[in-house]
């Protein structure tokens, strides 16, 4: 890959060193497991969590005479992902053998794509912010390529005191290796890139993005340089499996390299591992180059070819992606860019919000989903798929507010009841006597009693009309929060002679 610097140095992202400023350069190779029922070149299952070596075919185990057969669904998933990345789709690509010896690689080589990948250049737009002025910064990160390849098996070294075991369940599972250009200039940009990429493949349904299960992991390439100078020597941090760890690994590695260079040393090109317990990287091996793998075309596989109609059919069936959905939420529902960004960050959240917002005010629905629902889920460590409050229940609460049946304060209490106990919101309001008081006579009686009991406050209001809010609060307290706030405010102002 030819390295091209497309970014203008930005002082906001410089790292101060003992001898001046430095700039970190980051590129990523993300391995995303293809969502498919069977492996890339065999019919073995890809189901996660099965007993060791139970998802293994003769092809996966590299038994003599077994030939690979391409899985068409994996090809379609790769093309869908390429389209989602606004990338060039190569209608002719080749599979190559990447030769290296490792115990969990039965063939002695990995079937991958070297010179002719299935997907060419594309892009992802990430958004950083908001800043203190509430503004967002959009940054375009280039995609160099996407290619299909087999995953390796798994070596297990903690099962026996003197032996290592090999589990081939993962061997032969289809991976999409998505290679970015070296366009990122901070750990925040790298985390935003990984978050956005995971969101895109989840929307597309081409990868589940579950990093804790290993179905999405990143090799992070890090180098440093003086601003405006040529790229430095990079180190690759292998198999980082969380977005938080990606940020920590980049920050540590950048500081490590800066320290070496400022002491007069040189950076060795190498592969490193990130230790999340210590928050640091450590050397794994010297970094290999392409010639070390002795790539050559796989003689068992014909070139992969398809026509325009194949690509057009897949493009026509693509779902609405995060950027398009965010733009629609802002344009049609009047949401702020920030709120829309939160709601589209996960497909499940966007789907939930749209179900709540259907036929209702979009801003109101967004406030309840973001502030109340997501806030409650964050406090309990749950995600949107685990929510005890259905879209229908939250929508019913919003409807009760709009109808004047309950006040906003009562609605908060009602939400907590539904969250912890469940039930139909309307029935809960009825059975627990939570309806707000709209009877003007009853509200007026409460207002008169509060005014009569607080003559000193009445005098203060005459001098400072904004003090009327104190009376509103006292009336709401006296009625257990059930009085209609607008009616209370109007009566208080009328009784105290405050003009609107």
UniProtKB/Swiss-Prot annotation:
Signal peptide: none annotated. Keywords: ATP-binding, Ligase, Nucleotide-binding, Protein biosynthesis. It catalyses: L-glutamyl-tRNA(Gln) + L-glutamine + ATP + H2O = L-glutaminyl-tRNA(Gln) + L-glutamate + ADP + phosphate + H(+); L-aspartyl-tRNA(Asn) + L-glutamine + ATP + H2O = L-asparaginyl-tRNA(Asn) + L-glutamate + ADP + phosphate + 2 H(+). It holds the Pfam family GatB_Yqey. Transmembrane segments: none annotated. It is an enzyme of class 6 (ligase). Its EC number is 6.3.5.-. One of its GO terms (molecular function) is glutaminyl-tRNA synthase (glutamine-hydrolyzing) activity. Gene3D superfamilies: 1.10.10.410, GatB domain, N-terminal subdomain. SMART domains: GatB_Yqey. PROSITE patterns: GATB (PS01234). SUPFAM superfamilies: GatB/YqeY motif, Glutamine synthetase/guanido kinase. Belongs to the GatB/GatE family. GatB subfamily. Allows the formation of correctly charged Asn-tRNA(Asn) or Gln-tRNA(Gln) through the transamidation of misacylated Asp-tRNA(Asn) or Glu-tRNA(Gln) in organisms which lack either or both of asparaginyl-tRNA or glutaminyl-tRNA synthetases. The reaction takes place in the presence of glutamine and ATP through an activated phospho-Asp-tRNA(Asn) or phospho-Glu-tRNA(Gln). PANTHER family: GLUTAMYL-TRNA GLN AMIDOTRANSFERASE SUBUNIT B MITOCHONDRIAL AND PROKARYOTIC PET112-RELATED, GLUTAMYL-TRNA(GLN) AMIDOTRANSFERASE SUBUNIT B, MITOCHONDRIAL. Heterotrimer of A, B and C subunits. This is Aspartyl/glutamyl-tRNA(Asn/Gln) amidotransferase subunit B. The gene is gatB.
